[in-house]
Structures are given as C-alpha cells and as structure tokens.
Amino acid sequence: MKFSHTEEDRDGRHLDVLTDEEDGLRIIVSRLGAELISMARINEAGNWIGFLYRDNDVTAPAKGWANHATVMGYYLHRLKNGSSLYRGHEIKGGTHGFLRAKTWHLAGSFTNESGASLKYRITPDDFLLIEYPLKVSVDLTYRIDVTGVSVLFEFRNHEPELTAHL
C-alpha cells in the first residue's frame, strides 16, 4: 500500500488530504473544527465519488446545513438561552459546542506501507473559559489502513484533582 499526505488551502480553509494511492480511498479534513469534509473512493473512470453530505464542498450553501461530519463538543445540542452552569462555572455558546468553530492544530501526520493517519489537537489554550471552564485537551486521529477508515478521540484531563470533565 502507498499513502500520501498533502495540504491545500481552499476557500479560506486549510485542508489535509490523506490518500491511499493503491486502493483509491481518500479523506479530506479541514483544520477548522477538525472536520472530515470528504471520504471518497475513485471509480473506474478516475473520478472521486464521495460518501458524505456535501462531500468535498467547502462553499457556503444557499440554505441548510453547511457542515459534513462535524466534531461536536463539549456539549452536543444547545444551551438553553445560550448559557448554562457547569460545576459552578458559566458556559456560553451556540449550537453543538465550540469545537467545530475552532482551528485545530495538526499534531502529526504519519504514513507508511500499512497505513496513514492525521492527528489533530485542541488544548485549553485554544478556547476561552466562558466556552469551557475546565482544562481538557482533545486529540482526534483519522486513520486509513487495510481495514478502512477509523476515528479515535483521546481526552486529556489537565486537572487530575477533579473527576471526569465530560
């Protein structure tokens, strides 16, 4: 197997493209929200056929949902009236949390003959206390290998004196 990782800027987004060159599988991840915006296979005619809603389209739609496979958190729906209290700390935010609106750091890319991965990271330095008041980091890894595509979420508690934050 042969894998490649390339980067591109498109419509104001920084994208990472991870491709299985031999089996014709490709994922594209936007660093904005660490969002998977394309998962596609190449067909016999040499065209990429996507599996996601609005696959590989980063333009704003005329109406409707603008995302593809959103990473949501640390809360998943809405905060009533845009705010809530968590452990005595106020949280303010919109729908589906703040993670999808943040630019994540590419913490590493890895390719070899058996697979390839992209690891993204967001830390407490990347968000405001009003967005989430506790110190938690998230690593998100997308991987392609012989078994397919996988996604791994890893949470790191930077306040070990406190019990679970999520």
Regions of interest found by a model, annotated:
Residues 1-154, 158-166:
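Surface-exposed acidic/polar loop and edge beta-strand patches at domain peripheries
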